[in-house]
Every structure is written in C-alpha cells, then in structure tokens.
Amino acid sequence: MSLALGCVADDYTGASDLANTLTKAGLRTIQTIGVPEAGRALPEADAVVVALKSRSIPADQAVARSREAERWLRARGAAHVMFKVCSTFDSTDAGNIGPVMDALRADAGETVALVTPAFPETGRSVYQGNLFVGSVPLNESPLKDHPLNPMRDANLVRVLGRQSRSPVGLIDTATVARGAEAVAARLDALAQEGKGAAIADAIFDSDLEVLGRAILDRKFSVGASGLGLGLARALAADGRGTRDAAGAAVGEPVGGASACLAGSCSQATLQQVAAAEAIMPVLRLDPARLLAGDDVVAEALAFAEERLASGPVLIATSAPPEAVRALQAAHGVDAAGHAIEAALAAIAEGLVARGVRRLVVAGGETSGAVVDRLGLTAFLLGPEIAAGVPVLRTAGRPEPMLLALKSGNFGGADFFGRALDMMA
C-alpha cells in the first residue's frame, strides 16, 4: 500500500466525516479505528484515516497516540499527513490541538503548519482568523455551551496561540484570493518570522482548493474535512489517486434489527431526538439516575428487547445545557461524561447481543465509546446520509454491521429516520 494521503483524526465521527469527504472526491478511502495491528491486511487505498479518541484526553496521551498513527501512515507512503480536528475547533487552552500539532509538525520536519477548520459547505468559515458557525462567531453559537470544550473565543489565532509552544500567524482572505503561490509564499514568510502555525481564512469551497494546492507538497497540515476536500481535489488535479466513483457501495444488505443511541447534548441532537419520537419508541434516560447508581443499562435493554421485533428504538441520555452543567457541578466534568459514555457503550453491546446489526450513534465521544466497546477496527465507506455523515460498513468482522456515527451538531431534524432508511 502506497498512500496518496494520510490522516490522523481526533475523534471517530470526525474521521467518518473526513473519510466521507475523501471518498466523494474520488479517493479510495479506508477508516481504521486506531493504528492497525501489525500484519493486519487492508484493502488497497489512496487514503487512510486513522480514527483516534484523543480530543478530550490528557494532552500527553493524545500526542503519543497521534505520533504513533503518523508513523504508521508515513511507513505506508503518505507524503502528506493531515491532523483532522473538528470544524468548530473543539479544544481548551491545554489542548489538545496545539500540543498534537506541535509534535506532528516536528516529526514531519516542517517549520510551519497551515491550519484551518473551515468547511463552507457545512456552514463553517474563517475570516480574518475568526471562526463563524453559519452567520455568527463561534463564541455566540451553541458551541459556547459545549459540555467538554466550551468555545468562548472565535479568534483562532488567539485560541491556538494559547495551546501551542510556537507563535501563530494568519493567512488572510486577500492572500488566499491571490492563489496557491501567494499562500505558499506567506507560509514561508511566517516561518521566517518564527511562526509555527498559520490560521488560514476560507469563505468559499474554492478557497479550500487554493489551500490544498498550496500545501500538497508540504508534509503536514491541520484542518477539518474542508481542508481534506481541498487536498483531495489537488491530488486529483495532480494525477494522484484512482478517481473512484464517489459514494462507494456498502455491499450486500445486512439483516438484523436496528437501533439508535444519542449521547450528544447539542441543540441539533436534542431536536433530532424529539423528532424521532414520531417514528419510533424513544427511551430518555436520566443521566442523574445513572450517576446515582441506578441500573439504567438493564432498564434500557429491557425496553429495547420488548420492542426490537417490531422496529427500531432510540435510547438517549441527551440533556439540555443547564442540566449538563448541574451534573458536571455535582460529579465533575470528566466523571459525568465518562459514566454516560460507558453506559451507552454497554447498551450498544447489549443491543448487538440481541441482534442489532444497524446502529446509529449521535455524539463524538459516545461514538468513540461505542466503537471501542464493540471492538470494531475498520470501516468501508458507503453513501452519505447527511453532510459529513456516511453509512459505514464494518471490515474484518465475521458478521457485518452498518453504522452511522454522527457528530452532535450534524444532520437535520429527520436524521435518525433518514439514516435508518438508508441502511435498510
């Protein structure tokens, strides 16, 4: 295997989003869960996205896991490695974007890294270094209340500067408008100034293509799926990659039952859970009861077992921001989050034991916990359910499953029903 592009993603849903983007752009793409074991055979691919669950763990652990993934990708021919982060730049002043970026940039031998979470197609744009979600700055969007990484500053030069050991510069809209050569020259100038990173503006998808061309022959970059799109299109224009038809098939239909799990507390997921009540039985578990020691896992599995023969069910721990803050105040941010993730992962394991083979999961941390608990190691990419969310088919599992792993903020109100329809 000789890769045209290697990617290290800091969570599982983000990895699926990026792999979906690369597949649509014509690259044969595989998503692995963690670094594959030695000797594990994978299908031929143009790009591999190594999915880690490293966004909210201690920074030193995130760095170690990311470096291992980068080494694996380089050993398989990846001349360029992209560190995939969330399009809302989810992080705190302690990381993990800055520490991982610093380490991977140093390993790649680069002096400066281009960084942009922009993806205009999904409403994420960067102007003068400020990240916008739709028409509002990041710090005025619902992300200001993110339960793990509340985003209270839209200026990414400042945000990344507080995390990185190196100063951070800016590649502004005017420079991007002048084309790839101007962007490359600006990167070189910033490197001469001692900058270790450069936030790049991008307002239109065409800006992403400019950025992709500018960095294609550099060794490292940081971005969301939008930058992946720019790189994929640059690779295609350069004659690299196979240009497979977009939206690979997921093979033969998968039998068994269907279920949905929701752990995200984003406004989008809360709306999606409410909409799902019109089309399937929904069990809303009270996270406070879980943290008080009640056996909500057994309760959820009993609820599902009574209903799965008749159709899909949805089990949710999603709660509004004020309820989340109260739980975190009482139990601690990490303890509350980990307990809820572990419970949903145990429920997922129980659902699979009861015959579920099509599973939809809402929430990045929840998806990571579920995939780890089920022991899934790699996915093939299928059709797109909503922007950034593909159908995934397990690879290397004796009895295949179909999954959808959704970042909390992605998808319309009808997401759960739409996902199940596309998996049928």
UniProtKB/Swiss-Prot annotation:
The keyword Kinase applies. It comes from the Bacteria. Its EC number is 2.7.1.217. ATP binds at residues 264, 363-366, 408. It catalyses: 3-dehydro-L-erythronate + ATP = 3-dehydro-4-O-phospho-L-erythronate + ADP + H(+); 3-dehydro-D-erythronate + ATP = 3-dehydro-4-O-phospho-D-erythronate + ADP + H(+). Keywords: ATP-binding, Carbohydrate metabolism, Kinase, Nucleotide-binding, Transferase. This is 3-oxo-tetronate kinase. InterPro entries: 4-carb_acid_sugar_kinase_N (IPR010737), 4-carb_acid_sugar_kinase_N_sf (IPR037051), NBD_C (IPR031475), NBD_C_sf (IPR042213), OtnK (IPR050007). Gene3D superfamilies: Four-carbon acid sugar kinase, nucleotide binding domain (3.40.980.20), Putative sugar-binding, N-terminal domain (3.40.50.10840). Catalyzes the ATP-dependent phosphorylation of 3-oxo-tetronate to 3-oxo-tetronate 4-phosphate. It is an enzyme of class 2 (transferase). The lineage of its organism: Bacteria, Pseudomonadati, Pseudomonadota, Alphaproteobacteria, Hyphomicrobiales.
